[in-house]
UniProtKB/Swiss-Prot annotation:
It catalyses: 5-amino-1-(5-phospho-D-ribosyl)imidazole-4-carboxylate + L-aspartate + ATP = (2S)-2-[5-amino-1-(5-phospho-beta-D-ribosyl)imidazole-4-carboxamido]succinate + ADP + phosphate + 2 H(+). HAMAP family: SAICAR_synth. Keywords: ATP-binding, Ligase, Nucleotide-binding, Purine biosynthesis. GO terms for biological process: 'de novo' IMP biosynthetic process; cobalamin biosynthetic process. It comes from Coprothermobacter proteolyticus (strain ATCC 35245 / DSM 5265 / OCM 4 / BT). Belongs to the SAICAR synthetase family. This is Phosphoribosylaminoimidazole-succinocarboxamide synthase. The keyword Zinc does not apply. SUPFAM superfamilies: SAICAR synthase-like.
Length: 236
């Protein structure tokens, strides 16, 4: 598969066309941002970790009947994916109170919810990815009712699979962000990435943070946390 023109460059990834219009190549970067791009930095080795960790999760989900855009790893920082039309929604699943929901609702960090909470945010950098509900999504024609239900059910299924898998690695899946895309046939598949950039991972024994929060909060040990996740998942 030949890598062609750069199609899109985001905060954490570059997307390239290939000589087969059905596929793209995603390259993961070491650059890191937080707070809507206000904070920037470099996390050495992040691109490699996120690429390999995402591949582990995509393969696990495929094995459990969840369709994804993943095809194969091409290099330490690159993967081949199916071309999809990204739905401009972030689907967030929360098992514990942390981050924005703690600030928004005055919840103490670390409180476990009786059942997972699913939230939607409209993907728009200029607006700061505002939270939206089903009525907003329908009014803006971002997805229809059937698709909203499918996104919700897929997100909860993914949460169930990943949470159980990670507990076996002594990792708590606190919360995470998903993005989905439509195939040419109209099917919805999981896209983007699942990594320490998009998830909150806590050590199940110590509650130590093993994710991007270490960068956001200037906690230090950022590279070590990313590598620890990769190590526990057998990526290094």
């Amino acid at each position: 598969m030949e890598k062609l023109d750069l199609l899109y460059e985001g905060k954490a990834k570059r997307v390239y066309k290939t000589d087969d219009p059905r596929y793209y190549i995603i390259e993961y970067k070491d650059e890191a941002t937080a707070f809507d791009g206000k904070k920037k930095g470099i996390i050495q080795g992040k691109g490699t970790v996120n690429n390999k960790v995402s591949a582990v999760f995509f393969q696990l989900l495929e094995e459990n009947g969840v369709p994804t855009h993943f095809v194969e790893l091409l290099s330490p920082t690159e993967m081949l994916v199916k071309r999809v039309e990204i739905i401009p929604l972030e689907v967030i699943v929360r098992n514990y109170a942390a981050g924005s929901i703690s600030r928004r609702l005055g919840l103490e960090e670390g409180i476990k919810f009786d059942q997972p909470i699913v939230e939607f945010c409209y993907k728009n950098d200029e607006l700061g990815d505002p939270m939206v509900n089903n009525y907003h999504i329908l009014a803006m024609k971002l997805a229809n009712e059937e698709e909203i239900n499918a996104l919700t059910q897929q997100a909860l299924r993914i949460n169930q699979i990943l949470s159980q898998f990670l507990l076996g690695k002594n990792i708590i899946l606190v919360d995470f962000k998903l993005e989905f895309g439509r195939t040419d046939e109209g099917d919805i598949v999981l896209a983007d990435e699942i990594s320490p950039d998009t998830c909150r991972f806590w050590d199940s024994a110590t509650m130590e943070k093993l994710d991007k929060d270490r960068f956001r909060r200037d906690m230090g040990g950022v590279e070590e946390a990313y590598m620890e996740i990769a190590r526990r998942l057998g990526c290094v």
